[in-house]
A protein has these predicted regions:
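Non-DNA-binding regulatory cores of transcription-related proteins
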Residues: 81-155, 161
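Short, charged, intrinsically disordered terminal tails
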Residues: 2-4, 158-162
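N-terminal intrinsically disordered, low-complexity, charge/repeat-rich segments that act as generic
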Residues: 1-77
Length: 162
């Protein structure tokens, strides 16, 4: 078990592996592909200041290099939440939480994950999201208030699991 510190970067083990795979792909496959395109362009084209294809390649390379730096930084500084460290007695990073909106009875279930692995369409909510921030540290049965753009909403924690 670890003590949650909101200013740290957290990743689940699977999120860490996904970012590692993305970093490896960018460093090998994407860099090589862009380099090949530069070589092919150099062999067949004349460079000019208005060359949109060349500018597009430069922009793509800049994006790839910036993403590589970002991923390296995140992977070096992240706190990895191991499966064994995911709490079930209180909400934490890695927890699968079922909540119920007190006023409507509507239930939602999601996993609280690191910001870099958040994917709301697949029920993966960043620990930095307002709902997740409000839930972290609370226990099953607790009612928490969350201030959202639509107003204050009260949620009851129905279940917490790994």
């Amino acid at each position: 078990m670890f003590e949650f510190e909101p200013d740290r970067i957290y990743l689940t083990e699977s999120g860490y592996r996904q970012l590692e795979a993305e970093l490896k792909r960018l460093q090998t496959v994407e860099r090589a592909r862009i380099a090949d395109e530069f070589r092919a362009y150099k062999e067949h084209g004349e460079f000019s200041s208005e060359d949109t294809e060349l500018e597009s390649l430069k922009s793509e390379l800049a994006y790839v290099e910036a993403r590589i730096l970002e991923l390296r930084n995140v992977l070096q500084n992240a706190v990895i939440v191991r499966e064994a460290d995911i709490p079930t007695d209180r909400v934490g990073v890695g927890s699968v939480v079922t909540i119920e909106e007190v006023d409507t009875g509507t239930q939602k279930q999601f996993r609280i994950v690191g910001a870099m692995e958040a994917d709301p369409e697949h029920q993966k909510l960043s620990y930095q999201a307002p709902v997740a921030r409000a839930l972290i540290g609370h226990r099953k049965g607790d009612v928490v208030e969350v201030t959202l753009p639509k107003g204050t909403v009260r949620y009851r924690i129905v279940n917490i699991e790994k």
